[in-house]
Structures are given as structure tokens and as C-alpha cells.
């Protein structure tokens, strides 16, 4: 009979992987960790999560003792990541102490979840030159001291963070002098205009679509000024105001908005190469003279009844476009039929000289859609492949026959039904 291997008999390297993958502080696991065999590997664990979820109140003191005892190890190694997931209420001094010990262990990533409670920013972070990534989740920030700095922070995640006023968002961004990546998921509190002004920012991701939009007096939304930005991901179904300052370095953007504005929307992305756009705006969201001379790939969402007119405008503004994808990315249910497609009087330069790939997902074969498809096939002289994805599985269906019968100016174009 083979001898069974006990967990405590495993080599330190394997124990480190196991410890790093587990929430550390369930009482049963804590009891094992304080045994002599586990003390050595625990001090070497590079990824630690303090999670007090499901800790009974009577075991709270045991939990606190374990956390303090673990942190007070004198010979602990470098800590790559610390996650404080704290459902109970802790004093600012407790949190500051835990973060201080992590700073002493050269922590690189820090995440704090407080389940709606207020966080007093740990002052010890001001001296931490190793911290590169900070995530704040489900908490409230009421004070950002003028002297506070995060000197080496490259990535900041603000997830369901509640601020007391507009100025606090700008304040927390100002304390990050070398910030390159910002993620904002949900805006809470009394903030009306979220002002993102970060000269060093390279990557920005904003998701403001949780809950239902409600009427507010005045403007509510975002002002973005990030001249060094190269990658933008922006989803906002709640705001009524958007303003993008010039961002000449952006090469890739995924934008989904319902805000009905013009001229201050995607017109700032003049160097864009890859654009994915969903907009319910009834106006062209950039100045009439705008040219997207570097745009090679366009994905346009067809969930709005007005998408076809926006589509025609962008074709004229993107003379170098080589790949075009039409797709309904959302499950919105609009009662309005597709706005009447008006064929442009002049064929867009991208169709006559450059477009090679055309793809249409969720193609329904309505009269308006057929007119759009026919226009592209009849004018895209360089087209190599046109793919139509439909719910129809019958290759002899009338809808597919109509597509096959359409004139194709490009003899090299291959028609594909997916």
C-alpha cells in the first residue's frame, strides 16, 4: 500500500504556490499555518490575502492576533502582492500598520476592499518606492491630504469608490506623478464631473454603466485630458456630458456611449488606428473637417436605429480604412426601425482604394441592410473577403440568395456565410 503524502510533507516551493492561491485567514487554515512546519514557508509567501469573510465574531480576536503575528515575522521576504479584504470595521491605525509592514517588505501590488467603509489613506505609502499597482474597491475616500504622494505608482484601479465631491477625483490623480494606467469602474457619491487630467497616462479604462440612469439637473459626466494616452476603453451609458481634450497619441479605442453630443467626442482621436464604436448620438461626434488618416480598422455597433448615417460619415473621414466590421454588441431592444439609408453621392476613398475585409455579424437581411451591403459590395474595388453572419442555417435561403446575387466590383472578393 502506497504511503499517503501529507500536505506538510511537501517541498517549500510547492507549499508557496498553494499558500499564494488560498485566502489565508480562515480559522482552520490559520491553525495549521502557526504550526512549526508552516512558519518557514509562510514567511516566504509572495502573494497574501487577508480575508475576514465568514469569520465568526467570537473568532475575531484570533483573526487579529494571527494577522499581527504573521506580519511581525522578522525574516519575511519580499511581498509581491497584498490584498486586504476587510468586511469588519478596523481602525485606521490597524490598516496603516498592516500596509506599513507590506511597505517594509517592498510590496509591489496592493488591493484594499472595505465593503463601503471609509479609508484613511495610509501615510506610509508616501515613502514606498516599490508600489507599482494600487486597487481600491468598494470604499469611501473623504480626505486626500495635500502632501500625500504615491511616488512610483504606475497602475491605479478605482472600483466602486465613493468620493464626496468633484475635486477629490482630481486630487487622488494628482498624487500619482508617474501614473500610466487608470481603471475606473463605477462612479459614486456627489461627483458630477469626473475630471481626469493625467499628463503621463498611457492606458485608460472607464466603465460607467451600472444601475439605471436618472435625470439630474446640470451636467454629469467626464472631462478627459490625457495627451500621452495610447489606449482608451470607455463604456458610459449614464452620463449626459462628455468632453475629450486632444489625445493625438491614441492608436486604439473601444467607445460605447449614449450621450448625444457633437464635436467633442471622438474628434480628439485624430491618430486612431483601431476604433470600436457604439454611439446612439444623432449627430456626427466630431467636427465636419476631421480626417482619421491613420484609421485602418473600424468596428461599428448596429444596435442604434441611426447607425447607418454615422457609418457613412466615418467612411468619408477614414480614407485609409482596410477592415470594416458591423456588429450589434448589445442586447438593447429599440422599437425604432433602422433610419433610412441614404447612399452617398460620392464614393468614399477607402472603398475605392483600400478596403479589403468586410464582416457583418447579426445580419438580418432587411431592405435597409441589403442596401448598405449592396453599396459596399458594389464600390469596394479592393475587397478580398465579405463575411455575413446570420441566424439562417439554410444555404439556399432567400436572404442568402439575395446576397449572392449582388454585384461585386471586386472580382477577387470571396463571399463567406458564417
UniProtKB/Swiss-Prot annotation:
Residue ranges annotated for the F-box domain, each copy included: 4-60
Domain called FBD: residue spans: 340-390
SMART domains noted in UniProt: FBD
SUPFAM superfamilies assigned: F-box domain (SSF81383), RNI-like (SSF52047)
Pfam families linked: FBD, LRR_At5g56370
UniProt cross-references to PROSITE patterns, sorted A to Z: FBOX
Recorded superkingdom: Eukaryota
Protein name per UniProt: Putative FBD-associated F-box protein At5g56560
Source species of the chain: Arabidopsis thaliana (Mouse-ear cress)
Amino acid at each position: 500500500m502506497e504511503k499517503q503524502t501529507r500536505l506538510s510533507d511537501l517541498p517549500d516551493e510547492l507549499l508557496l504556490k498553494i499558500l499564494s492561491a488560498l485566502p489565508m485567514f480562515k480559522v482552520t487554515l490559520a491553525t495549521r499555518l502557526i504550526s512549526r512546519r508552516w512558519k518557514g514557508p509562510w514567511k516566504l509567501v509572495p502573494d497574501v490575502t487577508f480575508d475576514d469573510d465568514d469569520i465568526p465574531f467570537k473568532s475575531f480576536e484570533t483573526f487579529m492576533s494571527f494577522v499581527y503575528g504573521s506580519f511581525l515575522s522578522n525574516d519575511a521576504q519580499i511581498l509581491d502582492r497584498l490584498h486586504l479584504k476587510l468586511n469588519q470595521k478596523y481602525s485606521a491605525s490597524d490598516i496603516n500598520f498592516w500596509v506599513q509592514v507590506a511597505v517594509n517588505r517592498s510590496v509591489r501590488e496592493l488591493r484594499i476592499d472595505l465593503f463601503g467603509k471609509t479609508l484613511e489613506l495610509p501615510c506610509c505609502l508616501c515613502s514606498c518606492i516599490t508600489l507599482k499597482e494600487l486597487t481600491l474597491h468598494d470604499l469611501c475616500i473623504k480626505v486626500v491630504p495635500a502632501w500625500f504622494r504615491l511616488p512610483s505608482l504606475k497602475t491605479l484601479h478605482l472600483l466602486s469608490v465613493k468620493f464626496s465631491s468633484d475635486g477629490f477625483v482630481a486630487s487622488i490623480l494628482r498624487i500619482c506623478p508617474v501614473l500610466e494606467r487608470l481603471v475606473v469602474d463605477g462612479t459614486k457619491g456627489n461627483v458630477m464631473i469626473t475630471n481626469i487630467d493625467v499628463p503621463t497616462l498611457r492606458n485608460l479604462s472607464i466603465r460607467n454603466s451600472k444601475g439605471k440612469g436618472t435625470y439630474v439637473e446640470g451636467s454629469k459626466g467626464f472631462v478627459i485630458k490625457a495627451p500621452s494616452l495610447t489606449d482608451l476603453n470607455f463604456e458610459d451609458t449614464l452620463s449626459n456630458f462628455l468632453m475629450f481634450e486632444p489625445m493625438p497619441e491614441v492608436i486604439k479605442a473601444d467607445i460605447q456611449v449614449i450621450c448625444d453630443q457633437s464635436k467633442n467626442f471622438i474628434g480628439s482621436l485624430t491618430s486612431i488606428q483601431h476604433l470600436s464604436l457604439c454611439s446612439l448620438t444623432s449627430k456626427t461626434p466630431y467636427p465636419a473637417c476631421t480626417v482619421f488618416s491613420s484609421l485602418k480598422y473600424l468596428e461599428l455597433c448596429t444596435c442604434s436605429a441611426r447607425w447607418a448615417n454615422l457609418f457613412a460619415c466615418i467612411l468619408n473621414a477614414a480614407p485609409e480604412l482596410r477592415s470594416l466590421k458591423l456588429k450589434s454588441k448589445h442586447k438593447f431592444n429599440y422599437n425604432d426601425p433602422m433610419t433610412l439609408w441614404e447612399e452617398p453621392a460620392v464614393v468614399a476613398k477607402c472603398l475605392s482604394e483600400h478596403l479589403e475585409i468586410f464582416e457583418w455579424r447579426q445580419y438580418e437581411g432587411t431592405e435597409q441592410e441589403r442596401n448598405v451591403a449592396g453599396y459596399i459590395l458594389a464600390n469596394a474595388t479592393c475587397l478580398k473577403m465579405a463575411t455575413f453572419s446570420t441566424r439562417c442555417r439554410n444555404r439556399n435561403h432567400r436572404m442568402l440568395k439575395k446576397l449572392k446575387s449582388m454585384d461585386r466590383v471586386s472580382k477577387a472578393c470571396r463571399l463567406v456565410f458564417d
